[in-house]
Amino acid sequence: MRNNYSKIRGYFKLIRKRDGRVVPFDIGKIEQAIFKASQAVGEANRPLAQDLAKKVLSRLEKKTSKQEIPTVEGIQDIVEQILIETGHAKIAKAYILYRQHRAEIRAEKQQILNKKEIDEIDKHFDINALRVLAARYLRKDDQGKIIESPKELFERVAVHVALPSLFYDSKIYQKRGGAPLHLIEKFDHRKFENKFSIGKFKLNQFHLEALKSLYSRFVNNRQIKVSWSAFLNLFKKGYFDKYEAEIVEYYKLMISRQFLPNTPALVNFGNVLGMGSACFTLDIKDSIESIMDTLKAAAIIFKAGGGVGYNFSKVRPEGDYVKSTGGSASGPISFMSMFDVMTDVIKHGGVRRGANMGILDSDHPDIEKFIKAKEGNKTLRNFNISVMLMPEFWDCCKQNKPYSLINPRTGKPIQEIDPRKLLDMLVYQAWESAEPGVLFFDRINEFNPFYKSLGPIYSTNPCSEVLLYPNE
């Protein structure tokens, strides 16, 4: 147990940290540092640590005036002196080596973060974690230099997360709609950088841009009671300061590493793109226009750190007739290769590699080529692939009867195959290259609450744990 130092605290109430912050003075920390050093050399002695801490305090009082605030470095120098003067050379050596080790860690963190001094948040994260933050998440200027600290990162994310709560405030929100259709006033978010606050947290231009976007959405739903000008005026009056606690709560969750959001949120919240979702699905229709539009949309999503799932089953099979040119189609797998190359290009410039889920229905004429598409892991390296097993496939498997493959362009059968051989091929390829996976159309849609209104689900996110309709 630590001794009660309240009677010997002297006139020191504050201490200056290396980053310039002034915090309450705690002699117990001096005692603990000495005790750990003694423990490191096999001479753990709590009473000795307490006695030496008192000597350090006494020396500090003699060397420092009442008007001065002692520094961490100054106190640590005195600890070394006291340890040596009192004959505890082994403990002094351990303490000195520990100081040196900590100094080396601080220097490396300063270099990684491009800072002169690390702060209390930098101390929460080890060197490897800070390297990841610096490489992926901290904002940089056009020269690639870091212009944001981890503390600033977590603050901008926490503020962004809290913004929607403002719109559900009783003074703002009209749940059942029917509110006046307010004019969407012009607002240049760049001119109001850091001009509005929620408590101590200032809103940057990208927070304000997100705020205006949310406001417009609620106005279109007729759920906002006040005009945009009145809404901003509430900031000036400090009305929204009550949401500061929500920001602090989320901020503390992140810096304590109890919870960290996904990459898009860390990169984009309070930043240019603003996108926080990681999982998307896009539709692909049987036309070159649709395919290229989807390719462009996927590239934009990858740029912001998201991933995309697609079902390529609407694309006509390889060799099928193309009316506009009189030629033949290249098939879904060749177009998947185009998406794969695009993903490879984007991943070199983005915050992380892109991720794709390519799905093909089991009754597509190119299903056998699809199953073998990742054989030897030589192609489609930026894709997970899965076969959507249709209910008829299992019926044919059980009854050992031919399974029809359907041309998606005409809706007519063009070939029959042995379903059991197809299943064997699928199982072998999953063993050989861990691809493809399987999705069960009947099970997915058996519990789909939107089946009657929106139809079946036939696509998933890149990791396949989230079932989504196209363009979700």
Predicted regions and their residues:
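Extended catalytic cores of very large enzyme megasubunits
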Residues: 1-472
